[in-house]
């Protein structure tokens, strides 16, 4: 068995087209285009790449992009003041603070300061709580993107055993909630999980989000399982790889996402979908 690819490039392009159509419908109805404010503190090279990709996505979708590039020395108080200013602006629909932040700034404090209806990352406790009670408003981007990929591939999660490896607030926890909302049986694994390979071997659907190159081995994947690789890791030779040993896992899985070309592309597309949703909440 060789797995079929779940192609993030094709699926994200289709989602961007839908977002662009939604933006066009707004402007044709006499409403303004959605606006996304992106705040970058410091000069983390990976963050700069992510921010550039988000700006390109905005241009493709017709969303106005507002960039706030702040020095590494920016105080938490000054960052919170900028968030307050953007919260108050009626012409700004989404606010994104690029993570990670410098060590002297508490990310939880900043995330909680964002108006939940402008929290297009979906990280605010209000939005996480709504997802937990099956009343999602703005959903965390990567898990939402994964669910769109599964739907596009015609993969139903209902009644399936899904194993999520990783318990971060950004991916692992909301991913489990998304799967649970679609009636999967969900197991969350983490660094204290006993006999992790055996837990993973029972999975019909595996979502790997640990940030360790090729952490999930091919022989952990039971025949016919669906493998979703959220990881993006840069190796010493400059090449990118995921959290799954792709070449080995694809010989066991029925479907698998590649890295690059998989979940990462969906994260930007779902961010823009959230920005359109946020604009429609406001007007």
Swiss-Prot record:
NADP(+) binds at residues 166-168, 191, 232. SUPFAM superfamilies: Aminoacid dehydrogenase-like, N-terminal domain, NAD(P)-binding Rossmann-fold domains. Its EC number is 1.5.1.5, 3.5.4.9. It holds the Pfam family THF_DHG_CYH. Belongs to the tetrahydrofolate dehydrogenase/cyclohydrolase family. Catalyzes the oxidation of 5,10-methylenetetrahydrofolate to 5,10-methenyltetrahydrofolate and then the hydrolysis of 5,10-methenyltetrahydrofolate to 10-formyltetrahydrofolate. This is Bifunctional protein FolD. It comes from Laribacter hongkongensis (strain HLHK9).
């Amino acid at each position: 068995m060789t797995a079929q690819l779940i192609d993030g490039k094709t699926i994200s392009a289709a989602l961007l087209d839908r977002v662009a159509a939604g933006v066009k419908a707004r402007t044709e109805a006499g409403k303004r285009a959605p606006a996304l404010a992106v705040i970058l503190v410091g000069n983390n090279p990976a963050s700069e790449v992510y921010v550039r990709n988000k700006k390109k996505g905005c241009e493709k979708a017709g969303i106005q992009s507002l960039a706030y590039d702040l020095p590494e020395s920016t105080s938490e108080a000054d960052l919170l003041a900028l968030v307050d200013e953007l919260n108050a602006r009626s012409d700004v629909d989404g606010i994104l603070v690029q993570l990670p932040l410098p060590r002297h700034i508490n990310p939880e404090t900043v995330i909680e300061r964002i108006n939940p209806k402008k929290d297009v990352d979906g990280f605010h406790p209000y939005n996480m709580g709504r997802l937990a009670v099956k009343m999602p408003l703005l959903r965390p981007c990567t898990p939402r993107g994964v669910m769109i990929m599964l739907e596009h591939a015609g993969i139903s999660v209902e009644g399936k055993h899904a194993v999520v490896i990783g318990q971060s607030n950004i991916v692992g926890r909301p991913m489990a909630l998304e799967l649970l909302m679609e009636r999967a049986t969900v197991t969350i694994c983490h660094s204290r999980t006993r006999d992790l390979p055996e837990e993973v071997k029972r999975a019909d659907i595996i979502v790997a989000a640990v940030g360790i190159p090729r952490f999930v081995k091919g022989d952990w994947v039971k025949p016919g399982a669906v493998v979703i690789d959220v990881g993006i890791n840069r190796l010493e030779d400059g090449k990118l790889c995921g959290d799954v040993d792709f070449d080995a896992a694809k010989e066991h899985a029925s479907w698998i996402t590649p890295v690059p070309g998989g979940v990462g592309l969906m994260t930007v597309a779902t961010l823009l979908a959230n920005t359109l949703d946020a604009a429609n909440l406001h007007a």
